Every structure is written in C-alpha cells, then in structure tokens.
A protein has these predicted regions:
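Nucleotidyltransferase catalytic core that binds NTPs
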Residues: 1-158
C-alpha cells in the first residue's frame, strides 16, 4: 500500500462481497522495503478511498501479520494476485502463516485484468521519472500525494 492503487481497491471491493468485516492492515515496520509514504500517510490515503465501504477499517500494525490477525480475531488473510510471479511469494507467505497459526486461512483474489500489471512500485517509478499518465491506475488523492513527493524531491535537488 505504498501507495494504494486501484488494483488494491478492486481486490478490497471483492473482499467486501465475501466478508462482513474487512480490516486493511498496513504494516508500520516493514524494514525490508524502502517506503515513500509514512504509515500514517498510507493509512490516510486508504481511508479516504474506503469511506463508502462501512465494513472496512484501516489500521496500522507492527510485527507479524499472523499475530495481528490473532489480536483482531481475523480468521482469513486476503491477498491479491496479479500474475504467476506474485504467486510464488504469496504462496510462501501463506504457508508460513499457516505454520505459525493453523487456524488462519489465506485466500487469493485476482483484480480486474486491467490492473494485472499495476504495482505500487511501478506507479512510483513512473512518477519519479517524470511520467504522469497514471490517473486510471491510482485514486486522485494518491496522484496528488505522488505529485507532492516529486515536487519535494525536485526542490531538494535544485
């Protein structure tokens, strides 16, 4: 969710058709990734796009997702799959989560095919290298936030 994309929102809408309560869990201490937006900004950007989904809450967490799922009494983790390349990583994560908590299920949902190639990293790279044609791939508030990131970077470089 760094940043949230329309692909994420599509998977979230699909999850809402399956579950009465959906928690968007935003990791606050993912030290293996360099993030563009703070956890508070990521939570805010998501919240601004799910206000019409009453069963959705957006929360940050630290530590293992499986521990957070236990704490919130979630029994299912929903993950989006865009391509076969996603499956290997997601399969390993799902298996590890099952090893850590045999009661926790992982289900995979595919987004609409128009979002198969969309990723947060690709969107950021396009913006950081001067591209702007991502209005159909991310919500408007994310576009504005990305423009601010690019402006701040450009101001620091000049």
């Amino acid at each position: 969710f760094d940043p949230i994309t329309n692909g994420h929102l599509d998977v979230l809408a699909r999850a809402c058709r399956l579950f009465d309560r959906v928690i968007v869990a935003v990791a606050s201490d993912n030290s293996s990734k360099k993030v563009t937006f703070s956890v508070d900004d990521r939570v805010r950007l998501i919240q601004e796009n799910v206000s019409d989904l009453p069963q959705v809450s957006v929360e940050s967490f630290s530590g293992l997702l499986v521990d957070y799922a236990r704490k919130t009494e979630a029994s299912v983790i929903v993950r989006g799959l865009r391509a076969v390349s996603d499956f290997e990583y997601e399969f390993q994560m799902g298996q590890m989560n099952r090893h850590l908590d045999s009661e926790l299920e992982t289900i995979f949902l595919m987004p609409n095919e128009k979002y198969f190639f969309t990723s947060s990293n690709l969107i950021k790279q396009v913006h950081l290298h001067g591209g702007r044609e991502t209005h159909d791939l991310v919500p408007q508030n994310v576009l504005e936030a990305l423009r601010q990131v690019v402006e701040q970077r450009d101001n620091q470089e000049s």
